[in-house]
Amino acid sequence: MTILTFQNVKHILAASLLSLGLVACDKGTQFTEKTDDNTQTKSSIEQIKKNGVVRIGVFSDKPPFGYLDAQGKNQGFDVEIAKHVAKDLLGDENKVEFVLTEAANRVEYLKANKVDIIFANFTVTPERKEVVDFAKPYLKVALGVVSPKSHPITDVAQLKDKTLLVNKGTTADSFFTKTHPEIKLQKYEQNTETFDALKDGRGAALAHDNLLVLAWAKENPNYTVGITNLGEQDLIAPAVKKGDKELLDWLNQDLEKLAKEGVIHQAYEKTLKPVYGDTINPKDLLVE
């Protein structure tokens, strides 16, 4: 697999977003159906099997976790695990329909039945647990802040009265909105937009998951992650629609199986280790 960089992922995204991003609009998994004017609950897993495909929401512009490669194919750590989930559910890893999502759309896509499962670097928070059901976590993460080496940000206090770039609906957005109102936030939908804004000088720094900014800074040597571990360590997990206990229970069992089989570690070796090398101990990153 070719590791795609931030520099060219945005060009592939533009060409693929229309055809892939709206793919779920007419294939909603039905939880209820009308029969003789009586509403009967229908198994979500049964409906997925009837459809012959599981719809999984992933990122298109967040390498090495979820992105489109030069051929427009979905790649990344989240994608690797999602393929195994599809194989265990439907017997074939190709029976998955990847639906491109942005951070701010993840909850809405589940609510609107545009996806069955979200595998898009979804950080577990109390607020999100109120509106979706999270499965077992598979990654640990904190926040990081990246800035130009010429004007490095090494302490949050340096950001007072400055502009900080974040993505809408992310943990970074929530953290700085709640705890640092003195910092002006400039928000963007797509990761590529946010990093382009940093390069263009539209903000003093950019805050995102530390794993993402560390990977980006390795590709962009004029920038440094001056704050590598901000806030509490959080967990990243897949999610299903609120109340879909059947699919949630199945997913939890499958993730436990995949961890025991070493699949999650294999996904790390294939997608993350080529990026981070020895700078990150997998034990500090993976939940196995």
Regions found by a protein language model. Give the residues of each.
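C-terminal motif of bacterial Sec signal peptides marking the signal peptidase cleavage site
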Residues: 21-24
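Extended ligand-binding regions for polar small-molecule ligands
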Residues: 26-34, 80, 84, 88, ...
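Ligand-binding clefts/hinges and TM-proximal coupling segments of bilobed small-molecule sensing domains
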Residues: 28-35, 39, 49, 174-188, ...
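Extracytoplasmic small-molecule ligand-binding "clamshell" domains
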Residues: 33-118
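Short helix-initiation/N-cap motifs at beta->coil->alpha
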Residues: 41, 96-108, 151, 186-196, ...
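Periplasmic-binding protein-like
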Residues: 60, 139-147, 210, 214-255, ...
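Acidic, polar ligand-binding/catalytic clefts
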Residues: 83, 95-158
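A ligand-binding cleft/hinge motif common to bilobed small-molecule-binding domains
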Residues: 105, 122-130, 175-178, 192, ...
